[in-house]
From Swiss-Prot:
The gene is apaG. InterPro entries: ApaG_domain, ApaG_sf, Uncharacterised_ApaG. This is Protein ApaG. Gene3D superfamilies: ApaG domain. One of its GO terms (biological process) is error-free translesion synthesis. Residues 1-125 form the ApaG domain. Pfam families: DUF525. It comes from the Bacteria.
Amino acid sequence: MINSPRVCIQVQSVYIEAQSSPDNERYVFAYTVTIRNLGRAPVQLLGRYWLITNGNGRETEVQGEGVVGVQPLIAPGEEYQYTSGAIIETPLGTMQGHYEMIDENGVPFSIDIPVFRLAVPTLIH
């Protein structure tokens, strides 16, 4: 979990075995992000940047507007949650990144997304 004076980010990931194909080096993961506005004014998420690293060290960068097609406005004390997915070629990897946001006055700021693991459960004891 990462906190700023205004925003808290939590991420949970899960392996999607039914959509994965280890024989074809395809490991599918879903991740759920919860963004909480701890401030006293609304904030809006405008964009995202992800760095996805597989177990071999291969990095993929993903960036774009909003998340899952929206640029949510998050009121004070409220949260926004969404689920998305990632596909990597190894049973273990990581994701990290940041969100580009604006405050109530339109002032931009960035919130780091903590590093989290993408892992097939049988690999973690």
